[in-house]
Amino acid sequence: MVEIKKICCIGAGYVGGPTCSVIARMCPEIRVTVVDVNEARINAWNSPTLPIYEPGLKEVVESCRGKNLFFSTNIDDAIREADLVFISVNTPTKTYGMGKGRAADLKYIEACARRIVQNSNGYKIVTEKSTVPVRAAESIRRIFDANTKPNLNLQVLSNPEFLAEGTAIKDLKNPDRVLIGGDETPEGQRAVQALCAVYEHWVPKEKILTTNTWSSELSKLAANAFLAQRISSINSISALCESTGADVEEVATAIGMDQRIGNKFLKASVGFGGGCFQKDVLNLVYLCEALNLPEVARYWQQVIDMNDYQRRRFASRIIDSLFNTVTDKKIAILGFAFKKDTGDTRESSSIYISKYLMDEGAHLHIYDPKVPREQIVVDLSHPGVSADDQVSRLVTISKDPYEACDGAHALVICTEWDMFKELDYERIHKRMLKPAFIFDGRRVLDGLHNELQTIGFQIETIGKKVSSKRIPYTPGEIPKFSLQDPPNKKPKV
């Protein structure tokens, strides 16, 4: 059997960095090198301040870095020396050309494949870690075959990640399963077993599932689509609850106790975000359309449509509650990451809510404990989000939640950071304009509603009628928009 002694991972992002750090920790005899073209990112991985926030990640990196874990921009040497190469680069949704707004853009995958074959000799295992469309491995293999050399033997595997940001280290150390797909040839199965041997250092054999390459690729898309579907399903029920007096949390508890359904991913909110769910569902929609399965495509498109609707509905409630105008009103946005315990803002609902409120002329004061100021400005300056001068005129980044809420008409919770449960809301209420509104888009204040109402707040939340002074309103006049739409103006530097 092939023995893997050196691993190279191309891509030092949210997948490559944590995944290879855990492999290095669990396999001290394997030398792991993570490479990236972004020199600033590599410098951050080699510094005390890592480029991404993830609970437990810093301890893992510091225990291995400089021993058997290395971060470098020397991509070619790392490829040449490796027995196994992970491809862990971004696969964004296309914003132009055929399949724009849905299909995955594989230009970085293709660039990696060409660089690998250029710098390889002898036997090497190349493994997809990025989320890719079905048959992407076949595209990689075609590039390898078209550029082959004497004695070159490159085996292509699919090994999708199933980690969740915020619990990535826990998920990597104790995964539900490890999925490895490869060719059903003797050479392909030899490569599969070599990668299995790496994971068997800490993962029980019964949790390592092997399939053909296509099944592995589709399993990743399907898993994310099913999780996104559950969130959209419970969010659809939340709209019904607000109109009837039911509580979506009670409904979710009741249906979640059914063992056939289970209680995971039944938390109603302002909508799902992150770098995977929307991208992968849209990729699945495009795949179905390309295979002439329009009914299946429409089914999965509805998952995205419901997520968009939930965001627009929440923004409409904010505007409606504030006497149908937020023009020149200060609104505090608490939380900008797409979920707690991460600094990742990709497809964050905060971006969408901020866009809708900026379009109405609101002045936003934004606070997030882990998202840098520069990242917030970049996200809100996206050509599809704001006009040229909107961010400079309407957005202020606050150093703490109290500063953000000082003099505000309303505070809007967009990320479920635990610290938001512990704030001094009496202090906040005293400094806000009256009536003071709280819009809880993550239901983090559920146990505090009576106390907050006693203080004087008017509460609006997802899937529950709290304030008795108004009837929940579900308008549809806020127009749709998507970060995947092609920009109608040049992005700012």
UniProtKB/Swiss-Prot annotation:
One cellular component term from this protein's GO annotations in UniProt: nucleus
**Note on domains (UniProt):** The protein goes through several conformation states during the reaction cycle, giving rise to hysteresis. In the initial state, the ligand-free protein is in an inactive conformation (E*). Substrate binding triggers a change to the active conformation (E). UDP-xylose binding triggers the transition to a distinct, inhibited conformation. The presence of an intrinsically disordered C-terminus promotes a more dynamic protein structure and favors a conformation with high affinity for UPD-xylose.
**InterPro entries named among the record's database cross-references:** 6-PGluconate_DH-like_C_sf, NAD(P)-bd_dom_sf, UDP-Glc/GDP-Man, UDP-Glc/GDP-Man_DH_C, UDP-Glc/GDP-Man_DH_C_sf, UDP-Glc/GDP-Man_DH_dimer, UDP-Glc/GDP-Man_DH_N, UDPglc_DH_euk
This protein is called what? UDP-glucose 6-dehydrogenase
Keyword match Phosphoprotein: yes
Q: Which residues bind substrate?
A: 161-165, 220-224, 260, 267-273, 338-339, 442
Any Gene Ontology biological process: chondroitin sulfate proteoglycan biosynthetic process
Give the residue ranges for region: Important for formation of active hexamer structure. 321-325
Give the region (Allosteric switch region) as residue ranges: 129-135
Positions of post-translational N6-acetyllysine modification: K107
Give the superkingdom in one word: Eukaryota
Which regions form coiled coils?
none
Q: Which reaction does it catalyse?
A: UDP-alpha-D-glucose + 2 NAD(+) + H2O = UDP-alpha-D-glucuronate + 2 NADH + 3 H(+)
Active-site residues from the entry: E161, K220, C276
Q: In which pathway does it act?
A: Nucleotide-sugar biosynthesis; UDP-alpha-D-glucuronate biosynthesis; UDP-alpha-D-glucuronate from UDP-alpha-D-glucose: step 1/1
**Region annotation Disordered: residue ranges?**
88-110, 466-493
Q: Into which family does the record put it?
A: Belongs to the UDP-glucose/GDP-mannose dehydrogenase family.
